[in-house]
Every structure is written in C-alpha cells, then in structure tokens.
A protein has these predicted regions:
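Conserved alpha/beta-hydrolase
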Residues: 64-86
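Alpha/beta-hydrolase active-site loop
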Residues: 92-113
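Short beta-strand/loop motif that positions the catalytic acidic residue
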Residues: 198-199, 204-207, 211
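Short alpha-helix in the alpha/beta-hydrolase fold that links the catalytic acid
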Residues: 191, 215-225
Length: 241
C-alpha cells in the first residue's frame, strides 16, 4: 500500500546517462545514471542486488532520490549481466567479477567528474555486498554502507539451502559448481577483506534480525572483524526484515 500511495514527485531529478568500463577490463560497457545536485558535494556509488532490473529497482530509485534531496551526488548503474549493461556470462559471480565494475565506477568519477579520493562513498544492498571487495581494494572510497548484504559467499549458499529445505552439507559442492558455471572461484575474494583494512573509514551495517534469505550472521561477522581491527563501524539491526 505504501508504494501505491507514495508521492515520488519530490524525488525526481535530472540525470545524465553515463557509461564506462570495469577497472582492468576492456570490451565490457557498464551503463548508469549520474545525478549531480551540488558540484562541491561528495558522491555515492549505489550497488544493486538481484533481480535483473538492477538500477531500476524501487529501492535504488528511492535511495538516489533521497541522496539528491539531501544534497549528495550519486551514481547508480547496472552491474555486468544486469539491466542495460553488457552481458559477459549467463551466470553472475556474486561479486568475484562485479567488484571490478565498482572500481570502474570509482575511476570514472575521479577522471570524468574530478572527484578527489575520499569524496566517493559506496552503498550496497543484498547480493551487491561484493562491493565490499572494491572498498577493500580502493582506499580512495571514503565510506561504505551495507544493507542486508551478502558478505560471506559460502554462508549465503548454506542460507539458501536451509531456506529451501535441503541439507546444508550441499553448500560446499554448491559453491564449487557455482564457480565452475560462473568461470571463477566464488571463494577467491571475500567481502570480509574490507573489515581487515577499512582503517578509520566509516562503515555502516544495517540488517533485519529475521531476514529469511541473507542471515544477519553476515553483518554480525563483518562487525566482529571490524571491531577486532579497531575499525570504525556502526550498526542498526532491526527486529523485522
């Protein structure tokens, strides 16, 4: 009901259609929308989860509108194999390739819009949690906000098996088969790397305690890693999903 009656007119802004390539990869074009409301303001890269409509998901559009209303610039784009961006595989790689897309977005903002390192933040929702790998690799990303994010790839397979009523011991073979289909090991990189080298860069975690698909254990493990490294982490865990 809230979506049916929600007035979006206050959150509609002029945007620029943009395109760029992943860092270190040519031949793949990523496409998105850039909104600049203040040339002196910082910018946030938005990272979507599933399904395939990517940046067009209602929560992505609303987030971009909220950021603009608050005077913050934003870049929302489709990861590879989503939306209007190029397709390079029949399978997603749960962040193992996609983190390079985020680094490409960062590079584009630095080179084309003249942002300085530290002026670029990043948000990620659900399966977009692989963005944390980009945060781990690029110290110029000044802050990270994760909402119900997948931060442990083997764990999310285990979560899904349990949700569907299958034995959790299939998780290991599932990860291996998924990597074979995607053409990359799904455990080669981990979003948890970001908790090890965040330093004093702020990280905000929010998660539903009863999330039926991405268990709160993802965020809690990330939080524990950050605390053990004396990092700057803030959490908001809600009772309902």
């Amino acid at each position: 009901e809230i979506r049916k009656n929600f007035d979006v007119s206050n959150y509609q802004y002029q945007y620029e259609n943009v395109s760029f390539e992943p860092r270190g990869e040519s031949g793949i074009t990523l496409r998105g929308w850039y909104i600049e409301v203040d040339p002196n303001a910082p910018v946030v890269i938005q990272t979507h989860g599933m399904p395939q409509n990517g940046k067009c998901k209602p929560e992505m559009l609303l987030m971009q509108g909220y950021l603009a209303e608050a005077g913050i610039n934003s870049l929302s784009f489709d990861l590879r194999n989503y939306g209007n961006s190029d397709v390079d595989s029949d399978y997603i790689s749960i962040g193992q390739k996609e983190y390079k897309d985020l680094l490409g977005a960062y590079d584009w903002l630095i080179s084309e819009k003249q942002y300085s390192p530290g002026e670029v933040g990043m948000t990620a929702i659900s399966l977009g949690g692989g963005a944390a790998i980009a945060f781990a690799d690029e110290p110029g990303i000044g802050a990270l906000w994760l909402d119900s994010a997948v931060l442990d790839f083997p764990l999310v397979i285990k979560n899904e098996l349990e949700r569907l009523g299958f034995p959790s011991f299939f998780a290991g073979p599932g990860v291996r088969v998924g990597g074979w289909l995607a053409g990359v090991s799904l455990t080669e990189r981990s979003p948890l790397e970001a908790a090890e080298n965040a330093g004093d860069r702020p990280v905000f975690l929010t998660h539903g305690k009863e999330d039926p698909r991405v268990s709160i254990q993802h965020s809690q493990t990330f939080e524990e890693r950050m605390i053990s490294n004396d990092a700057n982490v803030t959490t908001w865990y809600v009772e309902q999903r």
